[in-house]
UniProtKB/Swiss-Prot annotation:
The chain crosses the membrane at residues 716-736. The lineage of its organism: Eukaryota, Sar, Alveolata, Apicomplexa, Aconoidasida. This is High molecular weight rhoptry protein 2. It comes from Plasmodium berghei (strain Anka). The keyword Protein biosynthesis does not apply. Keywords: Cytoplasm, Cytoplasmic vesicle, Disulfide bond, Host cell membrane, Host cytoplasm, Host membrane, Membrane, Signal, Transmembrane, Transmembrane helix, Transport. Its main location: host cell. The gene is RhopH2. Disulfide bonds join 50-75, 220-227, 768-828, 848-889, 924-1011.
């Protein structure tokens, strides 16, 4: 027999990875475990090494001689294998971690002694490592084990990148520097514009010559999108000016009546913009007058528009109608020429010029041939007007036209219907090749080595090659505009460039800048696209998928989308530039706290998608790359309650530290693109996939060069990357718009009962491979070559994919609102295209002898999927429990005999009870499948309607007491019904009789066993619904369930028992404890009585019609609830009385009051322990409500049963370890408990209460700080005020001086007074948490107020 001791508790412990508390179980020993492990030294003899291992596991005096003999044989063989293997370090590391993991689960000892003993065991196994190497290895083994146990605060990785967090000095400096530089760069704007004026006014010292070269200045490189707008306007002006000069020259050269007209003056209004109109005398006759033009105030009218000198009242009246003295006029060419014959000649000469220019393009030539004299005149009038004023002539819908619609851009020309002018510009300045289809094809470098040789400068942060600074700057200038110097020589000194500069930069917004990093990446991405074709897809491949006959349709789709959404696209581009800055900050983050220098097979994320900096040594791994990406993503999603003004693109000097969700911005554009492609919504995704070349062609035009002159605008490489990935995800990866029946399983996150359909996971695997392959931007990568821009795009891709999946600011894996499809697909992408199940299975096969538990190739997938499903399909938890499983499996192989989990009987039950949690969970689900089949057979046997709630209770109770799989469940069920107590006693006696463990230990194992399906109302309901769904739909099911659901609460209330016990001092009875959550329950009963009486009164009185009564009752009910919370939450009925203690009906939350922001900052009591009665406990367990102290929905694991020091616990009860446990306590099982504080309040905890020493946040994160939990922490006075219920309370985050949140360093425990009355006599470990849970009182209050307002409005 194995004696009662710690070795049994090696496997008794459930490492509660789905819980917020890290709790370990142990048996108390007479001898201090530290005394034994101090004997462990470096040994050569393998027998002595194995003895040391037994001592380290605290099992040396536990095993029988037979057990010990078997263990020693297996242990010595393993040591031989380790010493003879070539990859000894890998095996040694994993075995050492297995030992550390098993020891930490049941023994509480000094970390210093653990380190020394483990170091000596490792040296005994592998002497090739030096002393410093072994010490470092031990440190990382212990860190990894802490992570598995939930003690490592790795979530701080997520905080290190968020601008509001003050941790990590280096990151704080980097963030400050980023913000400081953004502000500094915005000040450059003040060098060009008068910031004090009401509107953006260009300073007088800015000459046109200097503005033309702005591309070389900081302003242009900081606001790339605005700079491109400026150069686009100047380029268009230059081209139109050139065309007009050619027309004038051609007319002069071909007009016979030379000297009759000054052709130059004929095609001109004035030589200067700012002067008195010479046409005022014609205003009311034949001269065209445009006065009703709605123009922006960003420019001064007298610098652009003619000033009219009125000559009589009529003109003055006309000016008054024009809303001012400044108007614009249009040249009347026909009147200016005078002679109709001369007019015809001049128009014909101009037409011949147009014919000559367009002769190689048949379509345009045909259009020119059809032009009459009036059409030619209108064309020339518009040219003359534009060259004179600098903006376009628009004569229609003048009330809706703003100056920004009249500036010379390609899209404005198209909107103004200047089609002929655009064609001429295209022909003269683009290319002689009129085949647009061919122009989209371009050559790229196919020589990988040559490609990387051009990226020849090493980036100081990532240590990856990037484009050299000179090449990048030259290419940036080229992108801006190639005609800049030509324009300067052509129009030297003209002030229209000042106007264009003003119009481009008037909307300068500090939140839409490009930092030097973003600018370099922006240039580098365009450079690699133009020269190498680096993108998600090959541009030439897209063009080859478009037929020439269909090409025009693609151009039109692209044109319509860009014309409609250009400003939104520019905005998206600027916001992604800030995202690139956040990625840059992530590279700067100090990752030393989050790496493991190990060669284990159980990494949390695979090498392929790791930060490149860790690729230099594949043994160095970041604990959680996912957290780094998630922290960046959270800067764009629900970062704070304050909403960012999305699409606010006008001038702003206010800097926001939170940003819009870039995925949402891109998704809106995706919808616009899908609609533009004229795709119906049924089923949308499939058609999107089939027509994707429309979208990709459009995106190619965004990157540029856009050969469609009608929609040409700024090059937007960042927006193109984001929109392309979003389009691919939404069209080929996302399943949300599929019909429910198509992917029903994947959209839910229910635990598995029946084995899964492999087709569902094959779809997931296929789409994961598609997405993983798609996000590679360089398909012909040379071996071992990697560039900076590839690394940034990789991280951008991962952030984008995370934003697609996120439903809140919670970690996506821990958010129950996220479907299993998204969780598993995102995990698969982070693993480089390997599903989390595949990775776990590979790890198990490599590290564990599966036959130990009856697992094999045929059932390992089901085994893993079941365990994954019970944890809400959380890949993070699966990898943790799988790692714990393989570590436990190694030791179990040496200690216990094998068994088959599919055939557990009374003889093997004790093996199941000490097996890893994954095995127990799988066995539970095998029981659940038997329960499902039994339910189906009983429902069918009783013809549905005869199946009553009593039958349901019988089925539940049968499986609640059953511990083993039955060969014939129906037969055993019938035996159970004959005598339930006798059946349970017989099964228990048989299990104890066959167990090779101590009888008391076996009894504890029997009592503590629980199965997922039978431990809560919700879980059993899921099983039941699954069984019923197998029988088909119908009214009988509705009738059947109506009775079941009405009685389920009674059924499960008596089954929910809190198993953990915490001792308190006897003086607890004398206090006036308040049940904080009692009003949630009592208000319901109170208000139902009130409204019932009101209903009877209203019905009898007849004062209200039958139609009015329901709304009146609802309104009174909601008002009653709200009033109760406000006025009655401190009533005596909510207090806890001495009789509740005497009847053992008092419970306490493990976690103290969590929402400390609700407590007034003058209140000395900032640490509050919440006690509740049994009635409130049952309500919280049954109701679907988010309780902060439970960090979500409550389970029995979140509570301790209160026991006074005068009472005695039962032998099988688990005791929370503290100094109040009586010496004569019958139970020997202990648990350690951890207390959490939200990270927002950690800054208040800076001093050791006992010694005054400085306490750092890092000390808390390392588990080196304890918190005092004395009697002054008990909740005895209400903290909620009226402000909490009318939603006006302002959260506080600072504690007053001398508050009761007392903390001390663990090393100072011996300084605590040996007095049970001391406030620190009871203390627990403190840790930091980032989880945000809504206040239930606030949420309910908000809902009640909303409902009352809605009803009153009716």
């Amino acid at each position: 027999m194995v004696k009662l001791s710690g070795i049994i508790l090696l496997s008794l412990v459930w490492l509660k990875l789905n819980n917020s508390y890290e709790i370990r179980e142990r048996i108390s020993n007479k001898n201090n475990p530290d005394d034994d492990i101090l004997k462990i030294n470096v040994e050569e003899d393998k027998k002595k090494i194995c003895n040391n291992i037994l001592i380290f596991l605290n099992a040396d005096d536990i095993l029988t001689e037979n057990n010990k003999y078997s263990f020693m044989g297996k242990c010595e063989k393993l040591i031989d294998d380790i010493k003879n293997e070539n990859n000894s370090p890998d095996i040694t590391n994993e075995f050492a971690l297995s030992l550390m993991h098993m020891r930490s689960k049941h023994t509480i000892t000094s970390s210093i002694n653990n380190n020394k003993a483990l170091k000596n065991i490792i040296i005994s196994l592998d002497k090739s490592m030096s002393e410093p190497e072994v010490i470092n290895r031990v440190k990382h083994i212990i860190r990894f084990n802490k992570y598995l146990a939930g003690k490592l605060s790795y979530k701080n990785i997520g905080e290190s990148l968020v601008l509001r967090v003050s941790s990590h000095e280096r990151m704080r400096r980097s963030k400050r520097e980023l913000v400081r530089n953004i502000l500094k760069d915005f000040h450059i704007y003040g060098l060009y514009f008068d910031l004090k004026s009401e509107n953006s006014t260009l300073l007088k010292n800015q000459e046109s010559e200097s503005l033309i070269n702005i591309k070389n200045e900081k302003l242009c490189q900081t606001y790339i999108h605005l700079c491109q707008k400026f150069y686009e306007q100047t380029s268009v002006y230059y081209k139109i000016k050139t065309i007009l000069n050619e027309v004038i020259k051609h007319t002069k050269d071909n007009y016979a009546l030379e000297g009759e007209y000054d052709i130059s003056k004929l095609f001109s209004l004035e030589n200067s913009i700012s002067q008195v109109s010479q046409h005022s005398d014609h205003m009311l006759t034949n001269e065209s007058l445009i006065y009703d033009m709605n123009k922006s105030n960003y420019i001064k009218y007298n610098q652009l528009i003619h000033e009219v000198i009125p000559e009589d009242g009529n003109i003055e009246e006309q000016v008054k109608k024009g809303n001012g003295r400044y108007i614009v006029v249009v040249k009347n060419l026909k009147k200016a020429i005078g002679n109709s014959e001369n007019y015809d000649n001049i128009m014909n000469i101009i037409k011949k010029y147009l014919i000559n220019v367009t002769k190689n393009n048949k379509e345009i030539l045909d259009m020119v041939m059809e032009l009459g004299n009036e059409d030619i005149e209108q064309f020339m009038t518009q040219l003359v007007f534009f060259i004179h004023y600098g903006f376009l002539l628009i004569t229609e819908d003048k009330h809706m036209i703003y100056l920004s619609d009249m500036i010379p851009t390609y899209t404005n020309l198209y909107r103004a219907n200047e089609v002929l002018l655009l064609h001429i510009m295209d022909i003269k300045f683009e290319s002689d090749d009129f085949n647009k289809y061919e122009k989209y094809k371009f050559e790229t470098s196919d020589n990988d080595k040559e490609t990387y040789s051009l990226l020849n400068e090493i980036d100081s942060i990532t240590q990856l090659p990037k484009l050299s600074e000179n090449v990048a700057n030259d290419y940036f200038s080229k992108i801006m505009d190639k005609d800049a110097y030509t324009m300067l020589t052509l129009d030297k000194g003209i002030n229209k460039y000042q106007f264009y500069f003003t119009m481009a930069f008037k909307d300068c917004n500090i939140n839409q800048n490009y930092t030097p990093l973003a600018k370099d990446l922006w240039t580098e991405l365009i450079y690699t696209f133009d020269n190498f074709g680096w993108f998600y897809f090959n541009p030439n491949k897209i063009m080859s998928s478009i037929s020439k006959s269909n090409f025009i349709r693609h151009v039109l789709v692209s044109r319509n989308f860009i014309l409609k959404n250009m400003e939104s696209l520019i905005y998206l581009d600027t916001q992604i530039s800030r995202l690139m800055d956040m990625i840059g900050l992530s590279f700067l983050a100090d990752k030393s706290e989050y790496i493991l220098d190990l060669s284990l097979s159980n990494y949390l994320f695979l090498y392929v998608n790791e930060y490149h900096i860790f690729k230099k040594d594949e043994n160095v791994k970041l604990i959680h790359t996912y957290d780094y990406i998630d922290s960046i993503a959270n800067n764009y999603y629900y970062f704070s309650e304050k909403k960012y003004p999305v699409f606010k693109t006008d001038y702003s000097s206010k800097l926001y530290t939170n940003f819009p969700n870039v995925y949402s911005l891109a998704y809106q554009l995706f919808n616009e693109l899908a609609i533009n492609m004229n795709i119906s919504n049924t089923p949308l995704k499939k058609k999107l996939k089939n027509k994707s070349n429309y979208a990709y062609f459009t995106i190619l035009n965004l990157i540029g060069p856009n050969h469609d002159i009608y929609s040409r605008g700024p090059r937007l490489i960042f927006a193109a990357y984001m929109l392309t990935l979003v389009f691919f995800i939404e069209s080929q990866i996302d399943i949300s718009r599929y019909r429910p029946n198509d992917m029903y399983f994947m959209k839910k996150a229910m635990p598995l009962l029946a084995p899964i359909n492999r087709d569902d996971f094959n779809i997931l695997k296929k789409r994961c491979s598609l997405l993983t392959d798609f996000i590679k931007i360089n398909r012909n990568k040379a071996k071992n070559e990697h560039s900076r821009v590839e690394e940034y795009i990789k991280i951008l891709n991962l952030v984008t994919i995370l934003l697609w999946g996120k439903e809140s600011n919670k970690s996506l894996y821990y958010d129950n609102d996220v479907s299993l499809y998204k969780k598993l697909l995102i995990a698969c992408v982070f693993n480089g295209g390997i599903t989390v199940q595949e990775k776990v299975i590979k790890s198990i096969k490599r590290s564990c002898n599966m036959e130990q538990y009856g697992l094999n190739k045929s059932n390992i997938e089901d085994f893993v999927n079941v365990n994954l499903s019970v944890y809400q399909w959380n890949p993070d938890i699966l990898e943790k429990i799988a790692t714990a499983f393989t570590l436990t499996c190694k030791v179990h192989n040496m200690i216990y005999e094998p068994f088959d989990v599919h055939k557990v009987d009374a003889k093997d039950y004790y093996k199941l009870a000490v097996a890893p949690d994954m095995v127990k969970t799988y066995h539970c689900f095998l029981l659940g499948r038997q329960a499902e089949r039994l339910l189906e057979s009983l429902i069918l046997k009783k013809n549905f309607v005869k199946f009553k709630v009593e039958d349901a209770i019988d089925v539940y109770e049968f499986f609640y007491v059953t511990r083993i799989l039955s060969k014939n469940p129906r037969e055993d069920f019938e035996l159970f019904l004959k005598n339930k107590k006798e059946y349970q006693k017989k099964q228990k006696d048989e299990i104890i009789k066959n167990s090779k463990l101590d009888e008391n230990v076996t009894d504890i194992l029997f009592q503590n066993y629980e199965c997922y399906w039978f431990k809560s109302y919700e879980n059993f309901k899921s099983l039941w619904m699954h069984a019923a769904s197998n029988l088909g739909p119908g009214a009988y099911l509705r009738n059947f369930f109506s009775e079941i659901w009405n009685n389920m609460g009674t059924l499960f209330k008596k089954q929910s028992k809190v198993r953990d016990v915490e001792y308190f001092n006897i003086n607890l009875i004398g206090g006036t404890l308040i049940d904080y959550y009692s009003p949630l329950l009592k208000s319901e009963e109170h208000c139902r009585n009130v409204t019932q009486k009101l209903f009877i009164s209203m019905k009898d009185s007849g004062t209200k019609s039958r139609i009015e009564i329901p709304d009146e009752i609802k309104s009174k009910y909601f008002q009653c609830k709200l009033d109760y919370y406000k006025n009655n939450h401190s009533d005596p009925v909510h207090k806890i009385y001495s009789r509740d203690f005497l009847e053992n009906k008092v419970y306490v939350f493990k976690q103290p009051y969590y929402l400390l922001s609700n407590i007034d900052d003058k209140n000395k009591k900032q640490l509050l322990r919440l006690f509740i009665t049994e009635t409130t406990l049952q309500y919280l367990l049954l109701d679907d409500i988010q309780i902060p102290e439970c960090l979500g929905r409550c389970t029995i694991e979140h509570f301790n049963k209160v026991l006074l020091t005068t009472a005695n616990a039962k032998p099988h009860e688990t005791i929370i370890y503290n100094g109040l446990i009586p010496e004569n306590c019958k139970s020997k099982i202990r648990k350690e408990m951890k207390i959490f504080i939200h990270s927002s309040f950690v800054h208040n905890l800076t001093r050791d209460y006992l010694t005054g020493e400085l306490i750092r946040t890092q000390d808390i994160q390392n588990g080196d700080v304890h918190v005092c939990m004395g009697s002054d922490t008990y909740y005895t006075e209400n903290i909620l005020t009226d402000q909490h219920f009318d939603l006006t309370h302002k959260p506080q985050f600072n504690f007053p001086e001398n508050n009761n949140y007392r903390v001390f360093l663990k090393k100072n425990i011996n300084k605590i007074a040996k007095n049970p009355e001391s406030q620190c006599y009871v203390h627990y470990e403190l840790s930091v948490l980032d989880t945000d849970i809504p206040d239930p009182y606030r949420e309910i209050g908000k809902d009640l107020i909303t409902n009352i307002e809605l009803l009153e409005s009716k």
